[in-house]
Amino acid sequence: MEKLTYQFLKDTGAKVPIVGGPMYPGSNPELVAAVSNSGGFGVVQPLALTALYGHDFREGLQLIKKLTKNPFGVNFTIFGGANKKYHKQMERWMKISIEEGVKFFLTSLGKPNEIVKVAKQHQIKVYHDVPNKKVALAMKDCGVDGLNCINWRGGGQTGIQSAEKFIEELHDIGIPLICAGGISNKEDYKKALEMGYAGVQMGTRFLATHECKVTQSYKQAIIESSEEDIVWTNKIAGNNSSVIKTKDVMQGGLRTGPVINFMLRQSKLKRYARMYLMSQGLKNYNKTAFDDSVQFWQAGKGVGNIKSCLLYTSPSPRD
């Protein structure tokens, strides 16, 4: 076992180096627990847990703890403090996570300085989503323990470069790198580890499981789609997000209008535009998760290797 893979397993408490990516929708307690029970490492998304699945945050964490005796993590989307109400809520969620014994935070979309500072006081590991080398180096300077390298094959908020490019640029960074994007079977998993990644993050593969509480039509769309069916839109969070090409998606358009486009190009306005888009997206996600007639489905380019809906009881990718 490579040194940094061992470090990742030590950081998470997982038995195999597979992260169940935090998803909205898809971050229901049953799925998070199933990933951890199988030897991987489930990560819960607080907004999905509360706003989508209707759990009080503390009670949701306690439910996951009842469903698995193995460790799991919590994801915090930062947004750079654009929304003070949300920022206060995130601080409350972090406090509750600490009280409930969570020992791993996965952060994204913003600078995690404050979270890292608090986490280190409680011996909590922090990994951060990164899209490129520049951000990766900045996050290491912030003191994060590992990097979740979001490549261009990922579902949801996707990256801008290949998994190979990340390794080429960051192979000597000295902290664990997780390959996030396009991992859907054991061949993808093995290839990522052979490239030099400490582990992988899987999202789309876990949506098409019996434990995931999204509609059957969503799961079936993943099973029936190919890599060519995945398109990018910036209407979810301001940056590119991968979705399955459907009539609903194309009718709504893939790109934001001129006002939001302008805001996204301004450093002082960008975070507010992203926050607005995310708030609008949350309304659509609620329909996506529970209404079979709504065809707005996030998924990555690994869909082509997903051929069935699984009961996730194996500690490594199948199919």
Where are these regions (language model features)?
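Catalytic cores of alpha/beta
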Residues: 134-142, 166, 184-198
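Hydrophobic alpha-helical packing residues
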Residues: 147, 200-203
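Glycine-rich beta-strand-to-loop/alpha-helix junction loops that act as flexible
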Residues: 178-183, 202, 311
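Amphipathic alpha-helical blocks and their helix-capping loop/short-beta junctions
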Residues: 213-278
